[in-house]
Amino acid sequence: AENLPAYRLELVPEKVNDLDGTIQALGRIIDLPEDALEKFQKNRSRHRVFDSVPLKFNLTEAEVARFAVDRHNFAGVEVVPYLARHYPYGELMTHVLGYVGRLDENDLRRVDAGNYRGTTHIGKSGIERYYEDQLHGLSGVEQIETNAQGRVLSVLERQDPEHGDDLILSLDVQVQQAAWDALGERAGAVVAMDPRDGSVLAMVSKPSFDANLFVHGISADKFREILNAPDRPLFNRALLGGSEPGSTFKPFVGLAGLELEVITPDKQVFSSGNYYMPGGSRPYRDWKKGGHGWVDIYGALEQSVNTYFYQLAYELGIDALHGYLTQFGFGDRTGLDLLGENRGVLP
């Protein structure tokens, strides 16, 4: 994520004689969508008297130029430069980085509102939200004395702002891109970790969406389109989805069998290609037609023999297996520094 220079249109309602007429006149030189006007009215209610209220973000160069020509006709209205959040990797990183969006009443209830005076955006999801306090820093304050015309006479008090922290992530863009490409057109998730320290090198959830759409305020129509898409691009499959662990689960079952002395390293089980629960008639199949023959734990792991681990899990029993697997974090959250992670399911 990076910050890029941009311009926003804002006004001080108390300094505008005819607010409705002024907004209509502004609409003739600057495109003001209905969504922007609705957000302006909502923002007015939470701003203090004589505070500037944003009317539109991310003005085009043409809009800035047109306003500059007619600026003398708009008392109390200003075009203000600011730094806008930009996500150069677009949808590739959205589900892990998250995004910032317009500050609203719900946001103010979870932060120190006094530290967000003059702030228009806040972390809404992902890394941006989890580390909001560190990234935001401290707002500056300046108390001034003015005359009746609004001219500054003196500065009574000043507290300089403090820059937020920079974050260096463990993510590797090349690994992230490789994971993204590997999924192709399929919906799914890929997480790549460094086994030496558990750091996350890639976290992909697909399909995704472009976080830049939310920075300046997404239109209601566009949001409905994304929200109602059948492939659910807003759903973070890496963080919220539940998937069977597949054969990656087998080493843990094998280790449980060894440590609880249900098997020995040289105990062999015959794999015929099908496994039947005692008293049952439903076959649970091996991946290899005809099975693998006699295998011990080494061969079962090497060849990923399904039937060996079906039998071992049955001999362990659900209570012993459950108790052992909880030691490895199955059925719990990982503690990843992202909000909203679901727990795993462990019978």
Question: PLM features: what roles do these ranges have?
Answer:
Residues 146-158, 195-248, 252-347:
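Beta-lactam-recognizing serine transpeptidase/beta-lactamase-like catalytic domain environment
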Residues 1-189, 204, 208-237, 242:
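Extracytoplasmic/periplasmic proteins that interact with beta-lactams or build/remodel peptidoglycan
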